[in-house]
């Protein structure tokens, strides 16, 4: 019996094109945006722009707001306090709205190739890994890393 797979992807230091390319190369069918606020200062990663790009590439887009990290969890993540992030996120996942979205996402992932999207490049530093552990422990996990955009250093050509 084939073990189902969940993909994760973060867009930190990546372009929209690199993220879409990584999703296509992995055969992802649905991008599950698990950001509480699907907004970004990075061009191409706000909800409407990202949805348009992935749909143009033949990939579905779904936003699961209740599976995002609430404000106090995001603050803990910025401080590097993974224990507090875990505590806050565990509480988020107990809410009825989150439980409903977890069931919806689980069902989707049992029938299609799904990637969980958030900002952090390293899934271990992100709530993507916490959601995986809670909801998909019986799935294989593949962390996609899109080509990075490395800023040029001053004085180099």
Predicted features by range, described:
Residues 1-157:
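Residues lining hydrophobic/aromatic ligand-binding pockets adjacent to catalytic sites
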